[in-house]
Amino acid sequence: MSLPNCPKCQSEYVYEDGILLVCPECAYEWNPAEVEKEEGLVVIDANGKQLADGDTVTLIKDLKVKGAPKDLKQGTRVKNIRLVEGDHNIDCKIDGFGAMKLKSEFVKKL
C-alpha cells in the first residue's frame, strides 16, 4: 500500500502509527479518513450565513472602486457569485461595472 504525501510539507517519508499517519520531517500527524471528509472552501457573509456558488447577494455599504468614476452603492444586487480562494473571495459581474472581486464581509445573502 502506498501512503499519501504529507499534506503540510509534501514529504514522501510518511509512516503509519496506529490509525494515524505521521510525517518525520515536520512532525505532522493526521488521520487519513478525516482528510477525505474535509469540506472545500467555506465563505461566510456579514450576517454569518454560508455562501455558495450561484447565490445572489447585496452590498451592505458603499464601496469605492479604484479607477471607476463612481462607487458601488449600498443595496446593489450581485447575482450568480463564484467563490474563490484569497482575501477577495467572491468573483462576480456587476451591471455597469463588469467583472469584480469582493470581500464577503461587505455582502449579505438574499
Swiss-Prot record:
Pfam families: YjdM (PF03831), Zn_Ribbon_YjdM (PF08274). InterPro entries: YjdM, YjdM_C, YjdM_N. Disulfide bonds: none annotated. PANTHER family: PROTEIN YJDM (PTHR30305:SF3), PROTEIN YJDM-RELATED (PTHR30305). Belongs to the YjdM family. This is Protein YjdM.
